[in-house]
């Protein structure tokens, strides 16, 4: 006999937890729709040359290859690269700026460890332009994710953001050539600490003086306005750096103008995002009181992601919530509601009154009351235990007395109170 088990890194929930997860997912989707994003669905399987078009070495290591095929196929690593392919294929049919959302599973060859998943849901929004895309969209993406996170009642959070042009311009100013390696090392600062970052920077041939100067730059802090003023006062003679500072300032002001609480936004010069395709604004989101959890929502601007698929310039900006990981984290912190059910009541007939229960069930359903009938030949105690296990608030009892009076006993399972009510009274109470 085969011992049933689920592979590590895969999510599989009991019904009551799945209901909570689906509710969170639906609330996020409702916000995306309210903000005028269109839903798309791309294949889980893509050609490897599509998946690896921009990801670099780390992405290549984590992509699941399909072994039984010689066609070089794999499972999608994220939803952004397939989006670039999608927009490139259908750009003649799309209206730009193209506003898209996608909530779907992605797959990564992660190590078996706590907080890492091989299959997980991502909730993505992106805005893609044709030849140009206003920086205003960077701010609008943040505003939409701000609303999405607020809708699911997570703890207080903070969008931390930066602009890669600032970092790349500063690297150039210091005479550092290997931008991408530097960005990847800085991206690890929160995880491995400053001493290990120094060691890794030295391994890419940065001398001690440049390392100290760079780290001192990354530590620039204060209010958001103070950080912007400090950056401007450095008088760095580098066009890319100046462009990045101006973009950072513009996006920050637009974020505030859209109604995001200033307490929920923070400029952090060490935010880089590890993926290679980001070119401007970059965002990471953290719980203020649970920083150890890591980023719960991230993204940024990518001006050249679709270059491998089309000669057209398709700049974009997007953000993503790793929903599976976020859900488990909220569970561990006891920040998601406990048992829930997705229907209003269970009808429990006494023996011989099953047909009455079925008729009542149909009448209630026709009146938009979500319900079911317990029709198994079990003792009354077992029937009530069933309702209790499903966390159903109301039970309707049908027996001889109820049928003779053409009424029904409505029992509140939370406090034990019972009422003898007519059908229309029950419908009004349950709807």
From Swiss-Prot:
SUBUNIT field: Homodimer.
Q: What's the protein name? A: Histidine--tRNA ligase
Please verify whether the record's keywords include Hydrolase. Answer: no
Aminoacyl-tRNA synthetase in keyword set: yes
Q: Where in the cell is it found?
A: Cytoplasm
Report the EC number(s), separated by commas if there are several: 6.1.1.21
The UniProt entry's GO CC annotations, sorted and at most eight, read: cytoplasm
Q: Which family does it belong to?
A: Belongs to the class-II aminoacyl-tRNA synthetase family.
The protein's organism comes out as Finegoldia magna (strain ATCC 29328 / DSM 20472 / WAL 2508)
Q: State one Pfam family annotation.
A: tRNA-synt_His
